[in-house]
């Protein structure tokens, strides 16, 4: 075999994925520090991956999710300690721009929450709030976002119709398009399919899998089946503690902690 053949047969090494979110020694308190809901959370979430947070109700999943873009700041009497970094930037630094942070880290909520305006105006709402007025730019981003959200073909002829006239599944995909329009690096999703029927759920799951190539996605879910279907990594929380965090296949086939095994096998009480 000559040198040219050797060079041809060498496969290029894949670049290791960067850490998108680093959470270190993170604690969270409600009620002016009297009630602790998260205890010493440590984890690293890789870029362009899907990570699901699982665990019983009240275990801290959503609290941690909303801490990643500081939505919990809107609640009176909360306190935090530790660090959360987004692509190595401390989100609690004194000079952080909260508006920019929430642009880079988009949020999709449990219940679809389109604004009572047109489909088009929903998608470009955030852009207009940033001062973007050029209609050509707004039109382009609207179309791109709806295409990415797998909704364009269904709404391209009714963009000026009320968003509230869409089905529940369409409304949730519209909310995803609205988040995408802001060109985030990360998408946070808080049980985005819990209010949807099985067919609409499947469409959103297919969309999320497709979005992974461009975004880092962190999703809270109560559906263990959903976690196994779509996520690369799974974190199991219990009573405010991160019990186990690993590749999803390992969590569901060979968990290291007995409490994780009990939960995924339905023995949690």
UniProtKB/Swiss-Prot annotation:
ATP binds at residues 55-62. GO terms for cellular component: plasma membrane. Coiled coil: none annotated. It catalyses: phosphate(out) + ATP + H2O = ADP + 2 phosphate(in) + H(+). GO terms for biological process: phosphate ion transmembrane transport. Its EC number is 7.3.2.1. InterPro entries: AAA+_ATPase (IPR003593), ABC_transporter-like_ATP-bd (IPR003439), ABC_transporter-like_CS (IPR017871), P-loop_NTPase (IPR027417), PstB-like (IPR005670). It is a peripheral membrane protein. It comes from the Bacteria. Pfam families: ABC_tran (PF00005). GO terms for molecular function: ATP binding; ATP hydrolysis activity; ATPase-coupled phosphate ion transmembrane transporter activity. Belongs to the ABC transporter superfamily. Phosphate importer (TC 3.A.1.7) family. The complex is composed of two ATP-binding proteins (PstB), two transmembrane proteins (PstC and PstA) and a solute-binding protein (PstS). PANTHER family: ABC TRANSPORTER I FAMILY MEMBER 17. This is Phosphate import ATP-binding protein PstB. The lineage of its organism: Bacteria, Bacillati, Mycoplasmatota, Mollicutes, Mycoplasmataceae.
